[in-house]
């Protein structure tokens, strides 16, 4: 923590980035308190105040139907952050598990899981997400699941490559000789070495 703060203190760009992230997260979390027109996040129509330029009442102006753009942006932050957090919370564990199993267990696990991953990777991500949404009801939850289907293969491929490179290392062989289970080797020995790459991919 101290090292991170020291880096931020000596690097203006890092500090600026951290402040921008803090502003976005703060705006999303406290949107109900900050937004001057919280009711404008929904299907509100106000043709008296449509297309207004920024002023003291409407900080960023209004849209075509009179809704305050600043309020809507704050609530959009909330939806975007929630989407990102939920998608990562589902996609990363799936992708990591698939990659570890295929890379470490090998044989038909490798062939079956990686061919499944290749099928998903062969489809353009946005096309895949839109195709899924075309088959189900267009809700936020279904949207999250569609994006999850788009993202997990990338983590699977990343962890698979790392696992293939690590499984013959001395520390892995030592754990196997000592009688460690496959799950222990995968999640306690190999996975920690993949965490930096996973975190980089997540951000």
Region locations from a protein language model:
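Transmembrane alpha-helices
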Residues: 78-94, 183-203
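Membrane-helix interface/capping residues of multi-pass secondary transporters
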Residues: 13, 107-108, 140, 180-182
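Gly/Trp-centered helix-boundary motif
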Residues: 1-96, 100-101, 107-111, 122, ...
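Low-polarity contexts
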Residues: 19-22, 175, 182
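Generic hydrophobic transmembrane alpha-helix motif, especially the helices
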Residues: 59, 63, 69, 90-94, ...
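Helix-loop-helix units of permease transmembrane domains in multi-pass membrane transporters
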Residues: 72, 171-178, 186
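Conserved RecA-like P-loop NTPase ATPase core
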Residues: 8, 175, 194
